[in-house]
């Protein structure tokens, strides 16, 4: 039986080992960063210990949910932070649980920028961004409530180094909490993406206009974080093709290529990119673009995400289109996803209505593993 299993494992590209810098991964199935809104008052909670440890396998790579770098970084209820001592202490047992099962765990550090409103901001001030352009109200994931956004305040040039420093300190705090590294959130219409995308960034100073100027803030964050904790512990997530939160770009391929070529200069560990087919939330669209030019240009580990199944994840690895594949919704609903992929076992269906509820169990830690259903 062991021999059969060993052979089966070898024939599944996603289940082959991979050396990511200093980290020896036993397979290529990555837990994507998933906002779950269960960190009450921005503090990670004990129920996250079980959630993350359920999704840990020996040599598996997990990316924690988006985690705010400062008190201006928040834009959703009960998302975690890492800017205070209390946050750091609350993360420690969660990180320890992942390490106890042999996992590698990175913290995704995040600033929402204009995707916020006064209610989430200190002293009810306006959210900050590269621009003063507001976002239109959006339907929440539950399809009932409407999210409203306060028009942002454009950051002055003098304020930008302070935001870069918030990312640096968040990375330092993540290391103090025991994380193996950090992923800089540069995707999905949040602050770093707002600076990069020409449909948002309307600045006329050194942080706006040309592609190089629009990417300046992102690369300053990368530089500061890499210098603080070492480039071999730093990744970044990018979505040049996506148009989330009214953050599109007129030439996404040029943006993606410029960014990966620039990232090579810093020697960071990985680049995590969203597939062009995931232009909007949760919808797979027909698309002629591919990530191959970025994949070929980037010298570190390449991670792809965006609507992958077992089949096309295996194909992407087998054909060299990516090194690792990040799974979100399927990993949320299948805590033992790598094992299910190995056995080609049926998958639990995910329940979208419980993605963002505050319940500490339902739709969070109650999805069964294969062992619990055997």
Swiss-Prot record:
The modification N-acetylmethionine is found at residue 1. Pathway: Lipid metabolism; oxylipin biosynthesis. The keyword Flavoprotein applies. Substrate binds at residues 185, 277. One of its GO terms (molecular function) is 12-oxophytodienoate reductase activity. Specifically cleaves olefinic bonds in alpha,beta-unsaturated carbonyls and may be involved in detoxification or modification of these reactive compounds. May be involved in the biosynthesis or metabolism of oxylipin signaling molecules. In vitro, reduces 9R,13R-12-oxophytodienoic acid (9R,13R-OPDA) to 9R,13R-OPC-8:0, but only poorly 9S,13S-OPDA, the natural precursor of jasmonic acid (JA). Can detoxify the explosive 2,4,6-trinitrotoluene (TNT) in vitro and in vivo by catalyzing its nitroreduction to form hydroxylamino-dinitrotoluene (HADNT). This is 12-oxophytodienoate reductase 2. InterPro entries: Aldolase_TIM, OxRdtase_FMN_N, Oye-like. It comes from Arabidopsis thaliana. Gene3D superfamilies: Aldolase class I (3.20.20.70).
């Amino acid at each position: 039986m062991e021999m059969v299993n060993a052979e089966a494992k070898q024939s599944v590209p996603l289940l082959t080992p991979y050396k990511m810098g200093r980290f020896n991964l036993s397979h290529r199935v990555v837990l994507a960063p998933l906002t779950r809104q269960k960190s009450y008052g921005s503090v990670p909670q004990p129920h996250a210990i079980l959630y993350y440890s359920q999704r840990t396998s020996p040599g598996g790579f997990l990316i924690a949910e988006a985690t705010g770098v400062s008190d201006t970084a928040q834009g959703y209820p009960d998302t975690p932070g890492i800017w205070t001592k209390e946050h750091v202490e609350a993360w420690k047992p969660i990180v320890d649980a992942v390490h106890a099962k042999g996992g590698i765990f990175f913290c995704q550090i995040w600033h929402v920028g204009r995707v916020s409103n006064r209610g989430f901001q200190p002293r009810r001030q306006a959210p900050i961004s590269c621009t003063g352009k507001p976002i239109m109200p959006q339907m929440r994931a539950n399809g009932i409530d409407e999210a409203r956004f306060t028009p942002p305040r454009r950051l002055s040039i003098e304020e930008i180094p302070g935001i870069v420093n918030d990312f640096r300190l968040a990375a330092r705090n993540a290391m103090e909490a025991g994380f193996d590294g950090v992923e800089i959130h540069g995707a999905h219409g949040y602050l770093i993406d707002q600076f990069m995308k020409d449909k948002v960034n309307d600045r006329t100073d050194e942080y706006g206009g040309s592609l190089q100027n629009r990417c300046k803030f992102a690369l300053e964050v990368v530089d500061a974080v890499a210098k603080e904790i070492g480039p071999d512990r730093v990744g970044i997530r990018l979505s040049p093709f996506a148009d989330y939160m009214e953050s599109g770009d007129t030439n996404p391929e040029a943006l993606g290529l410029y960014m990966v070529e620039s990232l090579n200069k810093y020697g960071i560990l990985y680049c995590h990119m969203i597939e062009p087919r995931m232009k909007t939330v949760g919808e797979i669209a027909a698309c002629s673009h591919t990530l191959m030019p970025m994949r070929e240009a980037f010298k570190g580990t390449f991670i792809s995400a965006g609507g992958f199944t077992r089949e096309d994840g295996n194909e992407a690895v087998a054909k060299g289109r990516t090194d690792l594949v990040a799974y979100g919704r399927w990993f949320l609903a299948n805590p033992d996803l790598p094992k299910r992929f190995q056995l080609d076992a049926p998958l639990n269906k995910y329940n979208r209505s419980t993605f963002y509820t505050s319940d500490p169990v339902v739709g969070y830690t109650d999805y069964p593993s294969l062992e619990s259903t055997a």
